[in-house]
Amino acid sequence: MSVDPMTYEAQFFGFTPQTCMLRIYIAFQDYLFEVMQAVEQVILKKLDGIPDCAISPVEIRKCTEKFLCFMKGRFDNLFGKMEQLFLQLILRIPPNVLLPEDKSQETQSYSEEEFHFLQKEIEQLQEKYKTELCTKQALLAELEEQKIVQAKLKQTLSLFDELENVGRDHGASDFREGLVFLIQNSRKLQNIRENVEKEGKRLKIS
């Protein structure tokens, strides 16, 4: 079988020429085997009609297999020549012929320098895309951080509103007075706690 991939021919036919030849070879080989089996059966029937025949079916089978090997060798030799003719003259697209989908290359051909330039430009665009993607990810991460900060700020403002409401409930006119009131009460609670702790220690000692 040919080792040439013949990719352009495969693009046109939809299959590789080598695959086509292989299928033809298998079909011929199967037909040869079937013919030899049929011939063997005919010979065996003829021998059954001959009285006291010294030729056994085993000998017939050996002769059939030997003849089959001979025919297969001749067939392989002939098929190899036929395959070369098919692949060179019938299933091959001439080098000066373009497929319809490639006709644009006749008027828009590229030199090797232009190809390398386009390849370099593609690489630059890929790098630019990667950079923009990283920038986008960084902006999204920053946006998430801003959302967290905004949520904490909202929570802090809500706490200040609660403190202001507590101050108003106790007679403070604004947030500053309410904060002073809370600080004073906090100090009072701290003093009470210290006194309780001292009293508890004194009772333990006594």
From Swiss-Prot:
UniProt KW keywords: Cell cycle, Cell division, Centromere, Chromosome, Coiled coil, Kinetochore, Mitosis
Primary localization: nucleus
Family: Belongs to the mis12 family.
Encoding gene, per UniProt annotation: MIS12
Keyword Cytoplasm attributed: no
GO biological process: attachment of mitotic spindle microtubules to kinetochore; cell division; kinetochore assembly; mitotic sister chromatid segregation
UniProt subunit comment: Component of the MIS12 complex composed of MIS12, DSN1, NSL1 and PMF1. Also interacts with KNL1, CBX3, CBX5, NDC80 and ZWINT.
Pfam families in UniProt: Mis12
Coiled coil segments of this chain: 108-205
CC terms in the record's Gene Ontology section: MIS12/MIND type complex; nucleus
Record PANTHER family: PROTEIN MIS12 HOMOLOG (PTHR14527:SF2)
Claim: Cell division is one of the keywords in the record: yes
Name of the protein described by the UniProt record: Protein MIS12 homolog
Function (record text): Part of the MIS12 complex, which may be fundamental for kinetochore formation and proper chromosome segregation during mitosis. Essential for proper kinetochore microtubule attachments.
InterPro entries: Centromere_Mis12 (IPR008685)
Subcellular location: Chromosome, Centromere, Kinetochore
Taxonomic superkingdom: Eukaryota
